[in-house]
Amino acid sequence: MPGPDRRTLLRRALRGTGGLLAAGLLPGAGGILPAAAQTRFSPEANILFFTIATGPPGGTNFPIGVALATAVSSPPGTPPCDEGGACGVPNLVATAMTTAGSVVNVKGVVSGIFNSGMAQADVIFRAYHGAGFDFEGAPLTDLRVVANLFPQFVHVVVRADSNLKTIADLRDRRIAVEALGSGTRRDAELILAAYGVRPSPDRILALDQGDLGSLLAEQRVDALILIAGIPVPTVMNLAERQTIRFLAIDGPEARGLATQHRFFATDTIPGGTYPGQNPVRTLSVGAQWVVSARAPEEQIFLLTQALWNPANRNLLTSGHASGQFVRLRTALRGIAIPLHPGAERYYREAGLLPS
């Protein structure tokens, strides 16, 4: 009879901690704690509690963050990795925290509210350099990257019955993007400008992602631009209700954007991601794991080592479809600010950086 899997062993070990933070470790659970309730270290139990700020419960980052928290945790009482137990950092218990998203996460990491966070590479870049959003003139220079995790694909969606064939065709059209502060609007403006499209402010609608699909379905806008891990629920719902098409981001314009802005990468939305959809050439922005420069080097080295332990692969791929993209070979892709020294040490030892 097969023994319990790693997730079951972690659940049992957490009972010995009074269940504290267990919700953040188990997929599908809430993982929500007020900042004041976060415990960094429990001397009595010899446990280090470690928070990972993710995103809204219905998004991609939260389930990936829960899987990440499970992978790097190894509570007291858990069997060692080579005996089928936890392959995380000894005596560390990580929890995934639901948040509003990237901007909140990078601010929270630098201010010490969170031990770490997940954020889009473009938001990380702008935060570090103090350019755009709430970061203008106030750079978060203490921000450091641990790893690039998975791509968040740029989706440009139109109705199948429209006459829009290329990004350049969006000139003078009504376009809906995610709300201001998400990073999507600024990226959308960069992409549109590369194709000679500079819409006036009244032609771009910024709304919560959940509201975007109805605008296109009701023909109140001509196109949607979203950046997210795949599949995107809003796009999936649209594709199941009506026929849609995707506009490619390709050619010299796409290559120029990826060259000029290090957080962009040329990419492809795989065929079959959405009903009846062929492969789509596009750009992607990495979802990356960040910490403060003040985090101890040895701790971040061990966290990076646990993240890329081959024994944790199934944990990372089971939480969400985007988990399939969390791979060591793309760990340094699209990183545009300094690595944390602990992470840098790991990648040098792993041969991904020159020694």
Model-inferred region functions:
Residues 40-118:
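N-terminal (or domain-start) structured segment
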Residues 49-84, 148-218, 313, 318, ...:
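Bilobed "Venus flytrap"/periplasmic-binding protein-like clamshell domains
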Residues 136-149, 154, 272-281:
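A structural signal for short loop-to-beta-strand junctions that line the ligand-binding cleft
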Residues 96, 101-146:
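N-terminal segment of the mature folded domain
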Residues 207, 211, 228-239, 246, ...:
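An extracytoplasmic/periplasmic, membrane-proximal ligand-sensing/linker region
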Residues 3, 25-46:
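C-terminal segment of N-terminal export signals and the immediately downstream linker at the start
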Residues 1-24:
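N-terminal secretory signal peptides and thylakoid transit peptides that target proteins
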Residues 121-123, 131-132, 162, 198-290, ...:
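Pocket-lining segment of extracytoplasmic ligand-binding domains
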